[in-house]
């Protein structure tokens, strides 16, 4: 079991007047190192702890960890390369980048990696050894040069780079083949480029990645923490031939950057395989036929298809002959075909796994009405929780339990076979206080999940007040319950889980503290001795205690229960099936309670739509081309079947229709009477104005549309689809520049999953923190579930101001 008794860390990264010394460190919240050589010291801030690490003389300090509540600093000789990282509450681990790096900058004078062989493959002699060669440079004579073990170093500032004495008596020394760091040049296609060039090839200034002006985009730094999207520096997050950026020119959306190639060989990309492992980026076999039997054409060829996935543009991807490869982060190896009518297809590569996981759709004979529904709450400490939640209290996506990226760990399905470690679902394999997961953010090792305890009354329906959105964890709330991690909790709980009274935040007895006071945190609600969470602790609200032997402890503040009328919160947890709308996944009945069926007054279903308030439905404007008279239409709510409607459905006529004035494919319908909000009829939430969904965000479409002969016709179906950034969607091989900024793409480029005729106007919803938000209205596509032709949806966030104005004035 991983140790986790120490406490969450202050999330303040204060700026130092001398610069930003913490830039020299990689930080990971919720992580600790097993260390033998260490010192435990007091420190009032993270910077003070970093200074102690720099000043240490008894050993080389490679890392430190800081415990904010105790103001405790532990400096260590080890880092993740030499020790085990484990999960711990209330701590942040800082590791010096220079000791994690296996590349050199300039002549490698500051190289502190672990390469220990020369360029000819001879093992290096230890710097402290005198055999077989008596050294001129040793740890004793040059203590500040990092002459540890037998690692390659450059103590004499040699222009040719790091070197070492060799273990060959005939060869006194030789140079080491250390790759260049990608801060001034790039290896391969610049996927790991970390430099500061911020102009394009034509000299245009780059737009900052965290800006949506002048170009709105889906490459949001907080959603892609491992892509290093800093400031406005050129980067390559999506498999282009080289780094690029969005430009500050409103007339030029994006352009490649001119980054020079490094002159040294690139770092090793790891083992290669003759079979499919993961997404096949390291597949090096000789399959050259696609899934439908088309022959692949050579990567160097430009007929019958012109393209830029060439050996020159992707020099590290082994684009040999016409073999299937995955040079750009697709879901599997693929190739361009020799068929002029089929530009490219995925290849069928044998799996490296002895028993590959089936990707067939669920059993079509399983009666959907009888399918058990997993409740999204947990009992006790959550060890028995087997739901499908995969989001933390701060909205981070969970890392798969079988994955070692970005966090290496031992909580695997093999090591914990009875813990239900499926996919990336929240679990509690080690008897913690509640379900948790490792996160996909490299700087945050783990967090608790955004789940509440079961109350015993889950699923009960209260009388429906007006629709209202719940606040998030940051919104101050005076209720004696909390949202998320309770950072906005402003209730009056003032005792810990053990019943000990809390110390007042302004008091310095019995515990003296400097960081969490009303003066230093004036907006954190540090009144009297009430439980609070000023540092965003994953454990929730806490306080310093009045027990002189116990510095602090957590408070027992429950999660606020969601009511049946909260937008975006279904009473039946959706299946979240990876199956297909075309090819099928029948939804759990009433798990998408905002889905409506738009019908003629005679009852024929022809379009979908989304309930966004008791009186208003959002749909596609082209769905209203049948008639300009509202009386022609009616709306069915709460249905699971397209025909033979259930007795509880609501049938309401349309009283008014409003099409978007600039002719976007979006329209509002006002119902003749408000819908009755029940456990089967709940509105979806609207997004913030102009919000942009991040690239590769997994969202869901629903509908009763054409299923092309597959099972489930006539029942509400669902599919999980990734959002595709417009920059990618508008490539020549996909939708070739036809997608507007007021639209978004979603779908699997292999085809097979899409919305079809009859799904038009229906919702594309994305889960954010604790609710589903309507991000798209199904609009158009080229065919139905065709390869390379993802579906196109109206981007709802661009029309929120119009939507709210129409609703307010009518």
Curated annotation (Swiss-Prot):
Q: Where does L-lysine bind?
A: 136, 158, 172, 432, 445
Could you say how this protein's activity is regulated? Converted into plasmin by plasminogen activators, both plasminogen and its activator being bound to fibrin. Activated with catalytic amounts of streptokinase.
Limits of the Peptidase S1 domain: 581-808
Q: Which InterPro entries match?
A: Kringle (IPR000001), Kringle-like (IPR013806), Kringle_CS (IPR018056), Kringle_sf (IPR038178), Pan_app (IPR003609), Pept_S1A_plasmin (IPR023317), Peptidase_S1_PA (IPR009003), Peptidase_S1_PA_chymotrypsin (IPR043504)
Modification after translation is described as: In the presence of the inhibitor, the activation involves only cleavage after Arg-580, yielding two chains held together by two disulfide bonds. In the absence of the inhibitor, the activation involves additionally the removal of the activation peptide.
In this record, what's one Pfam family?
PAN_1
Please list the reactions this protein catalyses.
Preferential cleavage: Lys-|-Xaa > Arg-|-Xaa, higher selectivity than trypsin. Converts fibrin into soluble products
Question: Does the keyword Hydrolase belong to this entry?
Answer: yes
Give the UniProt entry's GO cellular component terms: extracellular space
Q: What is its main location?
A: secreted
Phosphoserine occurs at 597, 688
- Give glycosylation sites per the record: 365
Q: How does it assemble?
A: Interacts with CSPG4 and AMOT. Interacts (via the Kringle domains) with HRG; the interaction tethers PLG to the cell surface and enhances its activation. Interacts (via Kringle 4 domain) with ADA; the interaction stimulates PLG activation when in complex with DPP4. Angiostatin: Interacts with ATP5F1A; the interaction inhibits most of the angiogenic effects of angiostatin.
Name the record gives this protein: Plasminogen
> Taxonomy-wise, where does this protein's organism fall, top ranks first?
Eukaryota, Metazoa, Chordata, Craniata, Vertebrata
């Amino acid at each position: 079991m991983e140790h986790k008794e120490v406490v969450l860390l202050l999330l303040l990264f204060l700026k130092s007047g001398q610069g930003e010394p913490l830039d020299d460190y990689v930080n990971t919240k919720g992580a600790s190192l097993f260390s033998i050589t260490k010192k435990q010291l007091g420190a009032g801030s993270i910077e003070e702890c970093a200074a102690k690490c720099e000043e240490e003389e008894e050993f080389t300090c490679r890392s430190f960890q800081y415990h904010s509540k105790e103001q405790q600093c532990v400096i260590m000789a080890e880092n993740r390369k030499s020790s085990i990282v484990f999960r711990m509450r209330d701590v942040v681990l800082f590791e010096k980048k220079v000791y994690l790096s296996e590349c050199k900058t300039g002549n490698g004078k500051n190289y502190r990696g672990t390469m220990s062989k020369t360029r000819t493959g001879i093992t290096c002699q230890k710097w402290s050894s005198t055999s077989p060669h008596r050294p001129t440079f040793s740890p004793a004579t040059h203590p500040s040069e990092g002459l540890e073990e037998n690692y390659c170093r450059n103590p004499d500032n040699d222009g040719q780079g790091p070197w070492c004495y060799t273990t060959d008596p005939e060869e006194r020394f030789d140079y080491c083949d250390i790759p260049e760091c990608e801060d001034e040049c790039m290896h391969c296609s610049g996927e790991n480029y970390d430099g500061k060039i911020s102009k394009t090839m034509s000299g245009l200034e780059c737009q900052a990645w965290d800006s949506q002006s002048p170009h709105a985009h889906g490459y949001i730094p907080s959603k892609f923490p491992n892509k290093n999207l800093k400031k406005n520096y050129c980067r390559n997050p999506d498999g282009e031939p080289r780094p690029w950026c969005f430009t500050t020119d409103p007339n030029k959306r994006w352009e490649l950057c001119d980054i020079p190639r490094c002159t040294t060989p690139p770092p090793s990309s790891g083992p290669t395989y003759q079979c499919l492992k993961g997404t096949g980026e390291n597949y090096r076999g000789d399959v050259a036929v696609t899934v439908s039997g088309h022959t692949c054409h050579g990567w160097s060829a430009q007929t019958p298809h012109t393209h830029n996935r060439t050996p020159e543009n992707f020099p590290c991807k082994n684009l040999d002959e016409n073999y299937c490869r995955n040079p750009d982060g697709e879901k599997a190896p693929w190739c361009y075909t020799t068929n002029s009518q089929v530009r490219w297809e995925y290849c069928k590569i044998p799996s490296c796994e002895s028993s590959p996981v089936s990707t067939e759709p669920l059993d079509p004979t399983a009666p959907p009405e009888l399918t058990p529904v997993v409740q999204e709450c947990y009992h006790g400490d959550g060890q028995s929780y087997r739901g499908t939640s995969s989001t933390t209290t701060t909205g981070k996506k969970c890392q798969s339990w079988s994955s070692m990226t970005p966090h290496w760990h031992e909580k695997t399905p093999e090591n914990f076979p009875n813990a239900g470690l499926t996919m990336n679902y929240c679990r509690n394999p080690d008897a913690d206080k509640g379900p948790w997961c490792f996160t996909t953010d490299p700087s945050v090792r783990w967090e608790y999940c955004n789940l509440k305890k079961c109350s015993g009354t889950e699923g009960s329906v209260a009388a429906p007040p007006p629709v209202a959105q719940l606040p998030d964890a940051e919104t101050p709330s005076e209720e004696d319950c909390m949202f998320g991690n309770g950072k906005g909790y402003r209730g009056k709980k003032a005792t810990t889980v053990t019943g000990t009274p809390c110390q007042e935040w302004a008091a310095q007895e019995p515990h003296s503290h400097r960081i969490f006071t009303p003066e230093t945190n004036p907006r954190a609600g540090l009144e009297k001795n009430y439980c609070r969470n000023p540092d965003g602790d994953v454990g929730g609200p806490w306080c310093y205690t009045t027990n002189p032997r116990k510095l602090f402890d957590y408070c027992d503040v429950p999660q606020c229960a969601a009511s049946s009328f909260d937008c975006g919160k279904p009473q039946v947890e959706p299946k979240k099936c990876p199956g297909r709308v075309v090819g099928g996944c029948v939804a759990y009945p009433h798990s998408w309670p905002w889905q409506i069926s738009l019908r003629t007054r005679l009852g024929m279903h022809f379009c979908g739509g989304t309930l966004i308030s008791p009186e208003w439905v959002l749909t596609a404007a082209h769905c209203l081309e049948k008639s300009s008279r509202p009386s022609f239409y009616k709306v069915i709510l709460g249905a699971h079947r397209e025909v033979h409607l259930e007795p509880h459905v609501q049938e309401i006529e349309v009283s008014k229709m409003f099409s978007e004035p600039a002719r976007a494919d979006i329209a509002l319908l006002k119902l003749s009477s408000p819908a009755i909000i029940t456990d089967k009829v709940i509105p979806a939430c609207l997004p913030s104005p102009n919000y942009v969904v991040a690239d590769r965000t997994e969202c869901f479409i629903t509908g009763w549309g054409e299923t092309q002969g597959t099972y489930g016709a006539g029942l509400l179906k669902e599919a999980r689809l990734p959002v595709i950034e417009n920059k990618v969607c508008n490539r020549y091989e996909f939708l070739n520049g036809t997608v507007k900024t007021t639209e978004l793409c979603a779908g699997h480029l292999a085809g097979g999953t899409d919305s079809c005729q009859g799904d038009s106007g229906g919702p594309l919803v994305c889960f954010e923190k604790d609710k589903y938000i309507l991000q798209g209205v199904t609009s158009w596509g080229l065919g139905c579930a065709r390869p390379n032709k993802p579906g196109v949806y109206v981007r709802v966030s661009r029309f929120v101001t119009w939507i709210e104005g129409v609703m307010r004035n009518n």
